[in-house]
Amino acid sequence: GNLPREAFVADDLRNLAYADVELPLGHGQVMMKPVLEGRLLQSLQPQAHESVLEIGTGSGYMAACLGQLAREVISLEVHADLAEAAQARLAAQDIGNVKVRCADALSWNPGRSFDVICVTGAVGSIPARFVEWLNPNGRMFIVHGQSPVMEAVLVHSTVNGNRIETLFETDLSYLAGAAPAPAFTL
């Protein structure tokens, strides 16, 4: 069924739940625009038998969307208050196959691999560790580069190594700790 996006939005922002804007979540994090969420899901196309790792839970809305499509979702959120709120919203929507963990993906170790990885914050460059968590024939959606012109890509894990498929240009706030080091200027 269709998930009410407003159920994942702060009360005072509910009238903006479907507007084409990024909604603030606190900690400098935002809920991505609905159009970007749609393109992300379209490019990943999680299947009913697949496992998904989401990096950056935020509101929990994308985790819920992924959970409706896939077999199971593990979602990482570095901020404890966001993680707790997201888990509560997922429970309220009766979505039982999504687990939110409070962890920093840049240092966390899953001890397993996944069919699909969805990274909801941008990175300066693609972390090798994320790619290593993909199952053979798995795929990862990630946005990388320098704001305001970043590239959304799918990283495909194949027997012959990894292939990067460019999807579209976009701009997205960085994953906590994953912004590029500022260029040194005099």
Where do the language-model regions lie?
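Conserved nucleotide-cofactor-binding alpha/beta core module
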Residues: Q45-R163
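Class I SAM-dependent transferase core
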Residues: G1-L53, Y61-C65, L69, L82-A92, ...
